Amino acid sequence: MRPNEDLVLLGDNLELLPQFDGETFRLAYLDPPFNTGRRQRRTTLATVADASGDRTGFQGRRYATRVLAESSFGDEFDDYLAFLEPRLREVRRVLDESGTLYLHIDYREAHYVKLLLDEIFGRECFLNEIIWAYDYGARPRRRWPAKHDTILVYVKDPERYWFDAEAVEREPYMAPGLVTAEKAARGKLPTDVWWHTIVSPTGKEKTGYPTQKPEGILRRIVQASSRPGDWCLDCFAGSGTLGAAAAALGRRFVLIDSNPEAVALARRRVGLFGPSGRAGKEVVTGRSARS
């Protein structure tokens, strides 16, 4: 099938992707579980006035901490590459000839996954290794702190892929005094190292979903590798950041996730974006692969 409206699908992406015609999507962004070997959790807390509370605040007032919501998903696979391979082959099939895949991964599996992508797409179709660098979280004392994710970029056809550098929001020069005033005012095209904060725990963008990615990262990807009206795919949709960025930039989208909680969140989120009040449609189909 070819979609004629934005979709948010609940089910196993390995069952749902074969239902789409080949060469349907201009852009695919995948943020699969990172195989960390642990369960990812996010707890939303609130502090409320309570005379018997366990915390003391301004002028001796007592407060208690309440858990508003908890969410989690498993992030452990016996054979991670065997899990990814059939899904990546399906993603390649549904990409059009000028399409691009962005695969978001971390240091534990990036080198193995790149070899897998070389096999599926071909080494000549490797475009970039993007490093998303941030500075947040714990700092181990017996090794260098890991403060980056890797985004591997592959194209369907190295002679025909779409990349629009002019559409990408530019960033300031690190040393503006070394370039002309005109260049400094215009900014520069980002390199393959993207310095960007994580989603602020207290910011408006926060949804409360574990491992939520910043919209700024997805906006840059959508701007560079798709045009207004193009179809974008995320088959590990999570909180729906790809859908939010795509709709805000005038693209169409299909989001897939096997977690009902993620699908409900993504459905609400994309309903707030898009021209003419366009909202994603929730379709429940397929078998849930993880919760």
Label the model's feature ranges.
Residues 275-291:
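Positively charged, low-complexity nucleic-acid-binding target-recognition regions
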Residues 1-276:
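Core catalytic lobe of class I
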